[in-house]
Amino acid sequence: MKRRIKQGGVCVLAAALMFSVFALPNTYAAPGIETDRECSIEVIAAHDEFSELQNLPITVKLYKVADVAVNGEYTPTEAFQSIDFSDVDSDTVAAVWEEKAALAKEVADTEEVTADAEAVSEEGKALFEAMPTGMYLVDAQPAESDYNTYEFKPYLISLPNNYYYGTGNDEWVYDLTGDNAIGLKPEKSDLYGDLIINKTLEVFNATNEGANFVFQVEATKTDVDTEEVRVVYSNVVSMTFDGTGTDSVKIEKIPAGADVVVTEVYSGANYELTTDAEASTIIIANSEVEVDFSNTHNGGQNGGTGLVNTFTYNDGEWTHSATEDSTP
């Protein structure tokens, strides 16, 4: 049996970065809904705080979760019968609607429900036309730029919508475009890549013990929107050789787009660089980038060794450890 939302049900408006629930009080009853009228929705993907969204192709899916009657009552569609709308009214807070939107997305994902409409944003906008009246789940899919990933909160939107509390006008709005377009609520996070430091020892002096080499690694990333520069990695790593050859050390999960400077700060007793002491690169998402250093023996006989000090911040405390070699 289909449940019906009690009379005086809800009308949901999702404005840019906002999730608002609008309901007409009984004393301001709106004219009846034209349930056979076609509607349209313009979804604005572009965002003032996240400039990359203007040009990223973002797939937006609409799922019809409920039909609407002339008097504004909603009846859940077959695929979304498990979502209870009977406890909502004009006093329902946004957090409750967010919870119901999350439940609707869970149903859509786990039950592999086919979207009623799908569009890809162009120049920061996705347009849906000829949409039947009802309540819809707006589900924008994650999108990636070169260095960042964006995820979007799902929400519910009513077609038609009503802006009585904002404008005092109780007319139903069937075209949510232009000034009535709806926005997305994005969350930005880093993509990551790995750094590999390659070291080649061309000549080894067997008279001395192992040859130790220490590298200072500094990585900074500039935010594409705020231009704020933040340190995303700062540490030292080392390698120990007991003969000639090439060895490597990998540093994983450095934010993509970070500018990395690797400096060989200790070349071991009696060894000198045959390459520059500093190498730079940019981290690429889901990839490995490499820098290379080479050394040779300088003919000296002085002994020497090296330790790598590592400081780790965990649960409010710094811990320290010292190792002779950072290689696996």
Predicted region positions:
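Solvent-exposed loop/turn and edge beta-strand elements of beta-rich ligand-binding domains
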Residues: 1-328
